[in-house]
Amino acid sequence: MNRKEFFAASVTGALGCCGLAVPDGAASAQTTNPPGPDREKEFVKNWLTDLFDTMDQELDEVTKAKLLAGCGRGCFRRHQFKQDIARLGKGSIDALLDAYKKNFQVWREGGVIHVRYGAVNKQCYCPAARYHPVKPRDMHCECTRATHQTIFETALGRPIRVEIVESLRRGGPTCHFVAHVA
């Protein structure tokens, strides 16, 4: 048994002993009334609303954008298909466009690459964005902007400026970004 297995077994045993020491009413209440998915969803919605409201009240636009950009870079690291786009587009704008086309509408206009989530969408693709209210100049879109920036920078090996053209959360019919590659 390695240390990790030993620790897991010890914690399980300790928790089992603690459960025996809990009065009957408390133990049965804990096991028969776990929070349901709807309660957890409501909690997450409220928590995200509070977070974004506080960010709006306490932080300047630059700081908010930096925070959400960190989330966007994390999203890139967490999702293999995003890493695959960068890997398949490594070192070549044309290869990057081909890799992007598997999941997005993309086209080039001179030194600008357009990335669009179709002409019209019914809802935001980000699951986290669905759990807090839409606002004008919605900062959540900075997360997605940073994800695309990370894909471009990883593939091309240099800083790339990515801008939000429009987004569902900001009142547009779709999400549309431009990457300045020239």
What are the residue ranges of the model-derived segments?
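Short amphipathic alpha-helical segments
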Residues: 144-152
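Hydrophobic h-region of N-terminal signal peptides that target proteins for export
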Residues: 16-20
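Short terminal or interdomain "cap/linker" segment that borders an active site or interface and mediates
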Residues: 7, 159-182
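A short, structural micro-pattern
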Residues: 107-109, 156, 171
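Short secondary-structure junctions
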Residues: 152-159
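N-terminal secretory signal peptides and thylakoid transit peptides that target proteins
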Residues: 1-14
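Amphipathic interaction/junction segments at domain boundaries or subunit interfaces
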Residues: 58-140, 146
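C-terminal segment of N-terminal export signals and the immediately downstream linker at the start
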Residues: 21-57
